[in-house]
Amino acid sequence: MAPRRNSNISSSGNSTQQQHQQQLQQQHQTQQHQLLQFYAENVNSSGVLMAPMQGTGGVGGVGGGGMVHCCLPSGDCRKLDTLIHLNELSLADCIRVLCNNENCSAGQYMHRECFEWWEASVLQALKANGRARSWSERQRLQHLWTKKGYELVQKACSCKCGRGQLRKDLDWVPPSSQGVIYLNGSGNRPTLANGSLSEDDDKKKAKKKRNRNNNNNNGGGGGGGAGVNGNTKTPLSNNNGNSYAGLTPNPNVGVIGSGLPHNNGNTASNGSSGNNGSSGVLQTSALATFSNILNTNNVLGLDLRARAGSLSSSGAGSGSTSPSDSQSSGEISVSPVQQLLPQQQQQQQQSLLIQPLGPAFGSNLLQNGLGLSKNLLIAPQQQQQQQLQQQQQQQNNLPALANISNFKPLASYEQQQLVQQQKNKEVELYSDRVRSTSGCNGIFSRRLDFSSFNLLPKTRLNSYQVKIEDEGNHGNDETRLFILSSLAQSQMSRVACILCEEPLLVFDRYPLVDGSFFLSPKQHSSGCIEVKYEGRTLYLTCVCMSCLDGTSSSRAINCRFCKEPWDGSSLVLGTMYAYDIFAAMPCCAERFKCNNCFKMLMHPQQRLSFYSDYSHGVTCPYCNTQDTHFVKPLTFCYAKTTATRLPTLAXHEAPLESPVGTGATTTQVPNAQGSPTASGCSSNTIASKQPPKQPLYNAAIDYSAPLQQQINPDLIGAHPHAQQHQQQVRQQQQQQQQQQPQQQQQQQQQQTQQQQSQQQQQQQQQQHQPVVSTFQRGNFPQQSHKTMNMMAMADVMSKYQQQQHQQQQQQRQQQHNLQPQQQHATQKGLEGLLLTNTNTSNNNSSSSSSSSISNLIISHNSASNTGNKMQPTWGQSDAISALWGCSSSSSGCSSGSGSQPSLSPTASSNGNDGSKMMLWAAQSSPQNAATLRDGFKELQRQQPPQQQVPQQQPHAASPTASLTSSSSSSNGWSASHYGKPNIWELPGSTGQRTPASSHDIFTDLLCNLSISQDNSSQQASSKADASDVSSNSSSSAGELLEAANIWRFPEYASSQLYMEEPTGGAAACMQLFNDYLNMN
């Protein structure tokens, strides 16, 4: 073996160093004699190789060379041979266990394989225990056989005897075949090899032994070369080369401020004289154990063996060691006073380690890790004398060593107190060291008690729902360090709740806060701290425990849309979640909509696999917008109190700025009360003129109302689109201010034009009305032939058409900002229609040339026909129904009641309730035709001309002609007929009128029609004409009226009238027709 690096150093020095060396040599010799006496008493005469503790440790009365059974509690040994030989070869592959039953006879040894199998079952029991459920695998293995873990699994460790519990003997060190040392002697013992051990065990132990050898070889020892006698063999131990000071530390443990040295040594090793002819075998680990226990300076009686890699066993080449190394290995830190004399300590250690071999030994002796000579067999006669000399030298040596470093030794009770305090502080070393290096600079508070959690229910006061600081010197503290370091960089020792803005202190240990932290991809308030977590930019946010619990009415928040309360009582307090806790608990379909186009990203009943998936960015399949769509602003989703349930955003609504080329401008906008339905009468031209809607932000809704109006001013930010909305409002106000003078000028011009047009209309009406009246009264009795009636009617209608065309041109000039009016019927079509209405009963057989008025009159006269004699009342009753577009049966009109008709036009409604006006008073219904005509005329004069009303499409003329009307008549009337326009539609009350009023034409038409009383010619076509009464027009007449219908609504007429008493309207119609019949 190569000599140590310090073995060739010269021993020359001053006289003081030589004196210390001599004293240490004498002390070493006395210790060797003491150990030799102990082993000589316990070694049996048979010379069997066995461990020192096992010589007297026979179980069940079995001697040192006996056998015992494996004490596996289940009784089923994992090996074929259940017997364990009490020798070094067998015990090297065994584990020793202890039973708390003093009278246990099951045994104390298990096979290593059996013990590992049994230990795995105990670990499963520990894992199932509630208190250890949060431990890691490393923690369970570390604390299984300690007091902390064994208390949890004690019941699962029942002994085979049935009266006690087993536990692993942590103090027992199994012997190793490679640790056997042959002493220099006769050499008649056989060589121990590894062949008796299994290869698997060697592989398991290889790594541990290799590390142990590396640590031992790095240490500075005092041994020189190996001397080999002629016929003797000296197997070298793997644990050689360590100094005695490394494995037997001074019991005067050095603690900070105690004034004691730290293993600087009153013990050094050098060779000892002995009997070269004697032989024996000694195990190194056993020697180390008993040398510590039998040391007279070990007042506490503790096993002060150093662990591998510790400060004392890592080598003695340098006396200065970092405090972190000492603390991490469980050793006690070096005194600061001792660090003041580094040069003196190095000289002293070098002098203690350099031990030249004296000539009195006669040969070079091998030294093991304890610095003991391999020749330990000394004559028993010399042992007592050497023991007395050793005690005297040690008593004299203590003051000498104390004076070397100027330290004062402590009494035994003080040593015990210091060791106990050091053990108690070992748990806190890790946390204190981490706290000092986490960059927090001590700005966080230390929690004194847990009284703040008394507000929680008793069922939540446990370690599962409140994060508690773990005990032990283990890690797994990344979350705490992440939070504290992030807050320390921002110099924040307290945070604010995101909901109630209550300040919360941050503590340096779990629970870190009286609430919970979470990371959100959106900054909910200005108090959220921007952090980097796993390469993502997130915001550290906090919620207090009162808001999480939600038991207080002032802290509860509800969803704005479904009004479901948010409950965070299931979250763990005092720690941090790596996702947005509000987004992870969606309550309704509004949470799954895109932030841009408001379309559903997933089905409302569908849920993601993990809570953190809701905080990740996704791409909308409709608008291709990539965003964290499931994370919504808190002010947008939640409210403290909601009086009414707010409407949801429709899926078809466009964003605030509608993209070009889309049809989003024609969509409806929902208000606070609900979204209006689309009307069938609206046209594309009207929708194209409407400005683009703003569905994302409604200025009428106070988005700051739900969350802490007074407590949390920073959180009450406006809606995400509020700023954009405000900018648009400002721009609109500026444009309006600029356009106000122009609009005022235009309004004044329009008013002057309207006044002029009204005057012209009144003059034309006064000029035209006498002509018509004279024509009506003077010519009607004289005209008896049909041809003259047709010519007179043609002249009247031609004049009417000319006046109508002139007025239309004037209106187009005045109303240049409105849509062009629809084209009216041509003169040819109008004359054809009027000529068709004057035909005799022979022409009435043709349905293609019939009209609504002819059908009405024919239906009235058809009561005298032979085909209708079975139904004498059918003609008058259905004539009234045909006039008002509904049947007089029990089905009634859509807006009437019973069999009474109504004047309310249900199909022509455009939603403008303010345009309704009474056609006549309910109590003063017209009783004759003159009263009806006068009422129409007075109503027309009261109308403000040229009212700007949105343009309407032509629709059913009958007040009740709609697709929703129903009829129960047996004549085959179909609901589709009600969609046809007819001439009986009454114009609206607020619409724009033409100069020639409609009631004048109505009078001309009635006065110039000749009704034939010949019933014989109408019998063939009575049934066909009767079927057309209900629809007010036949199929061909409806198509003709579409092109030339002078009785439809004006271009800008209003669409709704107030409902009038049905009885008055029916009576007026009957009186009208009675007057008409009397005229003939």
Curated annotation (Swiss-Prot):
Q: Give a GO cellular-component term.
A: cytoplasm
Q: Which InterPro entries match?
A: Headcase, Headcase_mid, HECA_N
Protein's job: Required for imaginal cell differentiation, may be involved in hormonal responsiveness during metamorphosis. Involved in an inhibitory signaling mechanism to determine the number of cells that will form unicellular sprouts in the trachea. Regulated by transcription factor esg. The longer hdc protein is completely functional and the shorter protein carries some function.
A Pfam family matched by this chain, by name?
A: Headcase
As a miscellaneous remark, the entry gives: Readthrough of the terminator UAA occurs between codons for Ala-650 and His-652. Readthrough is not always suppressed as the shorter protein is more abundant.
Q: What taxonomic classification does the UniProt entry list for its organism?
A: Eukaryota, Metazoa, Ecdysozoa, Arthropoda, Hexapoda
Q: Where is this region: Disordered?
A: 1-27, 181-277, 310-335, 655-693, 798-826, 891-916, 940-974
Organism of origin is Drosophila melanogaster (Fruit fly)
- Gene (name only): heca
Q: What is this protein called?
A: Headcase protein
Q: Name one GO biological process term.
A: regulation of neuron remodeling
Protein localization: Cytoplasm
Q: In which tissues is it expressed?
A: Expressed in all imaginal cells of the embryo and larvae. Expressed in a subset of tracheal fusion cells from stage 14 to the end of embryogenesis in metameres 2-9, lateral trunk and ventral anastomoses.
Q: Where is the composition biased (Low complexity)?
A: 263-277, 801-826, 941-974
Specify whether Endoplasmic reticulum is a keyword of the entry: no
Alphabetized UniProt keyword annotations: Cytoplasm, Developmental protein
